[in-house]
């Protein structure tokens, strides 16, 4: 397959390219003589799609502002321009040039209380980051040829000395999330992508026995949730256990 990936500087994109040797990737990044692909600028995107339209058929839209989470609270305008308007710009270009969009979303679009969320469950983000990604999902769903992957992924090794003991998620490492994405490219609709439900602390402790616990009450700069775990039955029907 011929695939354009936004967010080319990110670890997720790098794993996609490394793991997807059988595919052809375009990863436009900023260079001295090239400004890169700015999703906030529709005409920049349109120009790139027009120049490269015969070099790709799929767009994995992973370009977004994610961390630190507090940036979405402190600067919602930047979050809107990048994660909502930027996604809408990519969608419009995909519609114009007849490309399939695979949108990398998040488990933070769910309410984060009851856990085991299915793709059909109601969405009620508990952070402005979650709202920004849900806004992107709305734009993506306006275009029929789409796939939305709601993910819970983290770097390996875990980049912090402490991990939440009282927050459950369905986390997987970024490399594993990239493996799953490559197996799902021809699917459509919405699919939850993640590992088993467990606390962030327990997930990290499997690789780092020295990790220290931290609790939700210790975090004050951004809203957090107790249980963002997802039901991944739909994902498991498509991939086999050897993928992750």
Question: Model regions: which residues?
Answer:
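NAD(P)-cofactor binding segment of oxidoreductase domains
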Residues: 73-102
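NAD(P)H-binding glycine-rich loop region in Rossmannoid oxidoreductase-like domains
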Residues: 42-82
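Mid/C-terminal beta-alpha module of Rossmann-like enzyme folds, strongest
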Residues: 180, 184-227
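Active-site Tyr-X1-5-Lys
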Residues: 124-152
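Adenosine-cofactor binding site in Rossmann-like domains, unifying the SAM/SAH pocket
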Residues: 24-48
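Active-site "gating" loop of Rossmann-like NAD(P)-dependent oxidoreductase/epimerase domains
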Residues: 65-77, 106-126
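N-terminal Rossmann NAD(P)H-binding glycine-rich loop of SDR-like oxidoreductase domains
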Residues: 1-22
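Substrate-positioning beta->alpha
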Residues: 151, 156-186
């Amino acid at each position: 397959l011929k695939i354009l990936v936004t967010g080319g500087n990110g670890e997720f994109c790098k794993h996609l390219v490394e793991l997807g040797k059988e595919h052809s990737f375009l990863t436009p990044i900023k260079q001295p003589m090239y400004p890169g692909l700015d999703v906030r600028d529709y005409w920049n995107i349109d120009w790139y799609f027009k120049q490269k339209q015969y070099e790709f058929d799929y767009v994995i839209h992973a370009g977004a502002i994610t961390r630190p989470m507090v940036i979405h609270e402190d600067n919602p305008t930047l979050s809107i321009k990048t994660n909502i308007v930027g996604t809408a710009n990519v969608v419009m270009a995909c519609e114009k040039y007849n490309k399939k969009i695979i949108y990398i979303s998040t488990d933070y679009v769910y309410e984060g209380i009851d856990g085991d969320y299915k793709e059909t469950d109601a969405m009620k983000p508990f952070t402005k980051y979650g709202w920004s990604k849900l806004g992107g999902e709305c734009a993506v769903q306006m275009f029929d040829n789409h796939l939305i992957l709601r993910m819970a992924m983290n770097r390996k090794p875990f980049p912090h000395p402490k991990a939440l003991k009282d927050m459950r998620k369905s986390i997987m490492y970024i490399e594993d999330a990239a493996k799953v994405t490559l197996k799902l490219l021809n699917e459509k609709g919405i699919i939850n992508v993640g590992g088993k439900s467990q606390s962030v602390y327990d997930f990290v402790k499997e690789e780092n026995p020295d990790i220290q616990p931290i609790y939700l009450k210790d975090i004050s700069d951004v809203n957090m949730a107790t249980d963002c775990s997802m039901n991944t039955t739909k994902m498991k029907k498509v991939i086999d256990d050897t993928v992750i």
